[in-house]
Regions:
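Short, contiguous alpha-helical
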Residues: 9-13, 20, 28-77, 117-160
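Acidic/histidine-rich alpha-helical segments that form the ligand environment
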Residues: 78-115, 130-135
Length: 160
């Protein structure tokens, strides 16, 4: 495995640990509380990060889908809380997607990582590897939001 791919794998693993610490101990009834009317609740942020993590799985040749995934794509407006999947479903999805991603990353070939991606798709350098790097950065951004929401809900820091 190349150094770049090993670093990316380690970053996704570390993000997975941060996710666990950030969401640990928050009761399901608090996952739908918004810090303000214009912001997303924890369930939306976590599900969005999971759906985006699944993009990485698909780039690496894997599969994952859920009937609710379109509720959490970029730019989607919040819907009535009753339309969202349960906290348990979202956590199960995160765990399943994470297993698939962390299994697929070490087997990614240099040829796959160097393949160009469609113009306009987010990528650090226009390649599949660059898109995976962008997705990891994107995920880290949302982990920060999760940490803020955690603290705002009164559960203290997830890290540190």
């Amino acid at each position: 495995m190349s150094t770049d791919l090993q670093t990316l794998t380690n970053q996704f693993k570390f993000n997975n640990e941060i996710y666990g610490r950030t969401t640990q101990g928050i009761p399901p009834e608090q996952w739908l509380i918004q810090p303000c009317q214009e912001s997303n609740h924890l369930l939306w942020v976590v599900a969005h990060a999971a759906v985006t993590r699944a993009v990485a799985v698909r780039l690496l040749g894997g599969k994952w889908s859920a009937p609710w995934q379109s509720l959490f794509t970029r730019g989607q407006q919040r819907v009535d809380n009753g339309r969202y999947p349960s906290v348990a479903e979202v956590q199960q999805a995160w765990n399943e997607i994470s297993r698939r991603l962390l299994s697929a990353l070490p087997t990614a070939s240099p040829e796959l990582m160097g393949q160009p991606v469609e113009k306009g798709k987010p990528s650090i350098d226009g390649t599949v590897g660059g898109t995976l790097g962008f997705l990891c950065l994107h995920e880290s951004y949302h982990l920060g939001q999760m940490g803020f929401i955690r603290k705002w809900l009164g559960h203290g820091q997830g890290l540190g």
